[in-house]
């Protein structure tokens, strides 16, 4: 709800400045309800974890909060990436996922089904990979499940440049025209990328009909109508006063605090300031803003790293020593240094901390 409110407020401000560029709309490509079972997958932090049922329940709550239950949607949510997309990142543009029907139905589809049936999610984003030989953004099987079995009524969008992958990675088509036609003919209404610039030529060549193109356009305009973009709505007066308001920050802090699971403590937490003299913080994320925001982030007025948070809490009475220790993925923090050159610093911080 907070995300949708602030999104509407920013949208209203952008419209006043006639700014309708990328990332300025009301269709939010979230949540990511892919199943995260391999920690090497670089986008796992976007997901709700390894459990299909829990992922579906959390995703359903997110979609309901984002879209609201008023006369108009406050924002349009998007369940992604449909389907069987959980890495590997390096191969996703050519990879063919071939799960058993049991694994498909029990692992990879339940969360999407819940978001369609229980939350009425407005948008589905197709994945880069193929599923059983068919590209996810041009799949008879996936569309028959999505619209035929589940009754999905919203619009379907490709992941960015996924349709180009048809002829450059998956090699299921030979030209951009063929790729555009295959996608539209199989229910992909919107292309994130440039391949749909070839739709007119594909139509002229008889690869896709005007009826199919009209069907796709109608679904996209239906989303706009549901958002109230052609009418006056209850959200039109939301202003920048909503952005990072005290209430919203408090709700964000509460949600973050309630998400923590403390697996082991040994009497360390909560920190007792009166008994501490020196604290050591060791690791590449000790003072990293990137670790806080991840990818696809907005602009916050203030970021509080682990180091800064401890300094704020402990004040001047407790020394806070920090060492990066190592890089996230390389063997050195700085290019000109020797491998593991920060280890001695990390040891010193540890030795001189309580």
Per-range role (PLM):
Residues 1-354:
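Glycoside hydrolase catalytic-domain context in secreted enzymes
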């Amino acid at each position: 709800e907070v995300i949708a409110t602030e999104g509407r407020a920013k949208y209203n401000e952008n419209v006043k400045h006639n700014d309708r560029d990328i990332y300025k709309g009301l269709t939010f490509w979230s949540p990511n309800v892919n199943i995260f079972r391999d920690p090497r997958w670089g986008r796992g932090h976007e997901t709700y974890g390894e459990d299909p049922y829990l992922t579906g329940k959390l995703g359903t709550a997110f979609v309901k909060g984002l879209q609201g239950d008023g006369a108009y949607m406050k924002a349009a949510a998007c369940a992604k990436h449909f389907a069987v997309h959980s890495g590997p990142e390096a191969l996703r543009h050519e990879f063919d996922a071939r799960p058993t029907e049991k694994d498909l139905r029990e692992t990879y589809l339940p969360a999407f089904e819940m978001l369609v049936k229980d939350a009425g999610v407005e948008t589905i984003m197709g994945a880069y990979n193929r599923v059983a030989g068919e590209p996810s953004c041009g799949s008879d099987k996936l569309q028959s499940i999505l619209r035929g079995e589940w009754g999905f009524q919203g619009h379907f969008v490709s992941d960015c440049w996924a349709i180009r992958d048809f002829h450059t990675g998956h090699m299921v088509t030979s030209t951009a025209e063929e790729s555009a036609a295959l996608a539209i003919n199989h229910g992909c209404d919107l292309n994130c990328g440039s391949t749909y610039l070839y739709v007119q030529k594909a139509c002229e060549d008889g690869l896709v009909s005007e009826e199919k193109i009209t069907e796709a356009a109608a679904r996209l305009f239906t989303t706009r109508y549901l958002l109230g973009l052609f009418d006056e709505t209850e959200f039109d007066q939301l202003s920048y006063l909503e952005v990072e308001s005290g209430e919203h920050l408090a709700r964000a802090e509460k949600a973050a605090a309630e998400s923590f699971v403390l697996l082991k403590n040994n009497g360390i937490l909560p920190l007792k300031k009166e008994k501490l003299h020196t604290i050591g913080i060791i690791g590449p994320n000790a003072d990293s803003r990137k670790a806080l925001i991840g990818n696809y982030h907005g602009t916050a007025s203030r970021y509080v790293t682990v180091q800064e948070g401890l300094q704020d809490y402990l004040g001047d009475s407790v020394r806070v020593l920090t060492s990066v220790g190592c890089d996230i993925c390389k063997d050195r923090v700085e290019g000109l240094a020797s491998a593991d050159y920060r280890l001695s610093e990390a040891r010193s911080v540890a030795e001189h901390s309580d």
